[in-house]
């Protein structure tokens, strides 16, 4: 039998941290932010409360890390289809629609984000960290948008910042509407594509 690998201190801590994040995501999604305690997360991960606090400042920080990791993972899932779509704007928008329809059918992330924001809104430190996470998300959105826009549109286009802000804000609004059940994932995808097509046209005209 092969010898079991002995983890370094850093590897062991990274493993513990990931196990806590996985457990937190599972419980936050299943029970909601408010109903999930750190004790429950620690138990689900097979760890102690001390392990939680040695990796995260508290429940708010743990939740924000879950949101940040899942948001970036979902955004990264769009990169491959966009690249595979080639230079066709219609194909790129079709890739966006398919991606949005998939994530729109799973409202857990947007619901958790809403719970986190309302719970920490009056906490200046957590609000600052949430804003920092949002800025990083928008930076990643910029990378994807620069790949998705029609050929010939420069990355430093004067309307690019506006396009990113509107894309993120519109996406958040549509995602919330889907979570509330006022529109379905297919309709949400169609609205996202329509919005992006308008911006693509504006970028082309103004280049």
Where are these regions (language model features)?
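Helix-turn-helix
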Residues: 19, 23-61, 65
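Amphipathic, non-transmembrane alpha-helical scaffold segments
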Residues: 13, 21, 67, 127-138, ...
């Amino acid at each position: 039998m092969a010898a079991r690998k002995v983890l370094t201190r850093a590897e062991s801590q990274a493993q513990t941290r990931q196990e806590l994040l996985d457990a937190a995501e599972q419980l936050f999604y299943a029970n909601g932010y408010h109903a999930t305690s750190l004790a429950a997360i620690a138990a689900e991960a097979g760890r102690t409360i001390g392990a939680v606090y040695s990796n995260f400042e508290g429940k708010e920080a743990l939740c924000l890390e879950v949101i940040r990791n899942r948001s970036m993972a979902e955004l990264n899932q769009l990169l491959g289809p966009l690249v595979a779509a080639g230079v066709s704007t219609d194909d790129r928008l079709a890739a966006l629609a398919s991606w949005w329809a998939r994530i729109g059918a799973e409202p857990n992330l947007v619901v958790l984000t809403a719970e986190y924001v309302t719970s920490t809104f009056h906490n200046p430190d957590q609000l600052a960290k949430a804003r920092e996470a949002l800025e990083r998300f928008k930076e990643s959105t910029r990378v994807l948008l620069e790949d998705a826009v029609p050929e010939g549109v420069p990355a430093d286009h004067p309307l690019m910042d506006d396009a990113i802000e509107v894309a993120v804000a519109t996406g958040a609004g549509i995602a919330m509407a889907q979570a509330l059940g006022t529109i379905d994932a297919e309709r949400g995808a169609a609205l996202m594509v329509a919005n992006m097509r308008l911006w693509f046209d504006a970028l082309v005209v103004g280049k």
